[in-house]
Amino acid sequence: MSEVIGENEAKALYEELYKQLPRKKNLSMLVKNICKSSDTEKYVYELKDNKYIETVFIKRRDGGTVCVSTQVGCPVGCIFCESGRNGFVRNLTSSEIVQQIILLRRKVNRIVFMGMGEPLFNYDNLIKAIHILRDRYGLNFPTDGITISTVGPVDQLKKLREEHLKIQLTISLHAATQSARNRIIPHMRIYAIEDVVKQALSYSERHNRKIVFAYLLLPGINDRPSDVR
């Protein structure tokens, strides 16, 4: 049976761990490259197994938004996205997810899981990372500042509905018809649009959160007047 420690001991343990985080021996990844523009910074991280992921920091006047990766590669295969061109390699650990934010050394006021990979296909590590980010002795990040952007795998949306997280949710829909969505996100054809929307609205009702439905206009595919209607 493991020993249960008190609040003061737990706080001291967290403080010691976070003091050590910047030291290389405690990190499983390193910054390989940084590409900067006037309002964005793209970080390329090299992982211990020599794989690479990207994290994007978008500057704001009072801090910034960080777009975090959850997988190496992506199994979804959206036709407009480069992340899945070489297929899916592996899930990131919860530590690798959190380290992307720590290594930025920037003031972050919004975290969006919309980098490389489909967040809900790395469900367990994603949820563990969110708990670490929200922990008052961890990064103590506010729930309202965390968003999952997902193509909406229905089974995982059902699980997310039962979590006591109340985080923000964006559904990458990108189509009004099943045929158009199958063309845009071919590996999600097993999920009907109606079921994705239904589960998203169920999450909204349970957690009192507005759902954002993302729709990228693609000429000749989903930009017809009938799609708008």
Where would I find each of the regions flagged by the language model?
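Cys/His-clustered metal-coordination modules, chiefly Zn-binding fingers
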Residues: 99
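Canonical Radical SAM [4Fe-4S] cluster-binding loop centered on the CxxxCxxC motif
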Residues: 59-95, 103
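Flexible, acidic/Gly-rich N-terminal and inter-domain linker regions that tether
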Residues: 1-64
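Short aromatic/hydrophobic contact patches that present stacked aromatics
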Residues: 42, 65-69, 147, 214
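Short, small-residue-rich loop/turn micro-motifs
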Residues: 47, 72-74, 173-175
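Short linear Ser/Thr-Pro motifs
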Residues: 28, 34-38, 69-70, 83, ...
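Conserved AdoMet/S-adenosylmethionine-binding subsite of the radical SAM
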Residues: 106-110, 115-229
